[in-house]
UniProtKB/Swiss-Prot annotation:
F-type ATPases have 2 components, CF(1) - the catalytic core - and CF(0) - the membrane proton channel. CF(1) has five subunits: alpha(3), beta(3), gamma(1), delta(1), epsilon(1). CF(0) has four main subunits: a, b, b' and c. It comes from Populus alba. This is ATP synthase subunit a, chloroplastic. It is found in: Plastid, Chloroplast thylakoid membrane. HAMAP family: ATP_synth_a_bact. The keyword Chloroplast applies. Gene3D superfamilies: ATP synthase, F0 complex, subunit A.
């Protein structure tokens, strides 16, 4: 009897999981355009968190740093080390860009696990981490593509395009294709990992609501930080590669 009751409860949990929908969106109509409201709302929240934390912490810097100031200085030093390792001695101008990518993705990823987005009801769909939406990750990847094209052109001028026929002109199609696959790999890697993490938590909460999800959520926080680091590191590596001209 207990086995039958457990089986029924399990089936009910699976039925609830089947009701979880992925891909519903809430739009604002502005003029003749449809604006993806979910992404904008959650992205604005993340930006406010970042700006608010920075302003509160560093608006009055101390000679003897406070804990908050120490934390932000550590983050800056960490981002500088990543940028210098991947880009080289000309890393300086790119620290703000790499840092912005890292912090935005990091806070966005963590917001999916730590902020109660689901208590805010929308007419369609529900709020989630900005990086849980393919529009956000593609936009970040395209910004990275623009950045490494700009880095290469500003360093070498039109001679930058000579890389497409190196070491032999036969590789021209492959070298061109490579520049399309870079943003694709960046965007889909980040999107897939964050979406999968949130779906796993939803499934486990539906099946075992009190015990299993907790360690999985901690694992999700860890992998979210790793994904932010991977994205920022690869972005810096692509910029350094375009400036150096080697693959």
């Amino acid at each position: 009897m207990n086995v039958l009751s457990y089986s029924i409860n399990t089936l009910e949990g699976l039925y609830e999981i089947s009701g979880v929908e992925v891909g519903q969106h809430f739009y604002w109509k502005i003029g003749g355009f449809q604006v993806h409201a979910q992404v904008l709302i959650t992205s604005w929240v993340v930006i406010v968190i970042l700006l608010g934390s920075a302003i509160v912490t560093v608006r009055n810097p101390q000679t003897i740093p406070t804990d908050g100031q120490n934390f932000f200085e550590y983050i800056l030093e960490f981002i500088r080390d990543v940028s210098k390792t991947q880009i080289g001695e000309e890393y300086g101008p790119w620290v703000p860009f790499i840092g912005t990518l890292f912090l935005f993705i990091f806070v966005s990823n963590w917001s999916g696990a730590l902020l109660p987005w689901k208590i805010i009801e929308l007419p369609h769909g529900e709020l989630a981490a900005p990086t849980n939406d393919i529009n956000t990750t593609v936009a970040l990847a395209l910004l990275t593509s623009i950045a490494y094209f700009y880095a290469g052109l500003s360093k070498k001028g039109l001679g930058y395009f000579g890389k497409y026929i190196q070491p032999t002109p036969i590789l021209l199609p492959i070298n061109i294709l490579e520049d399309f696959t870079k943003p694709l790999s960046l965007s889909f890697r980040l999107f897939g990992n964050i979406l999968a993490d949130e779906l796993v938590v939803v499934v486990l909460v539906s099946l075992v609501p009190s015990v299993v999800p907790i360690p999985v959520m901690f694992l999700g926080l860890f992998t979210s930080g790793i994904q932010a680091l991977i994205f920022a590191t690869l972005a810096a590596a692509y910029i350094g590669e375009s400036m150096e001209g080697h693959h």
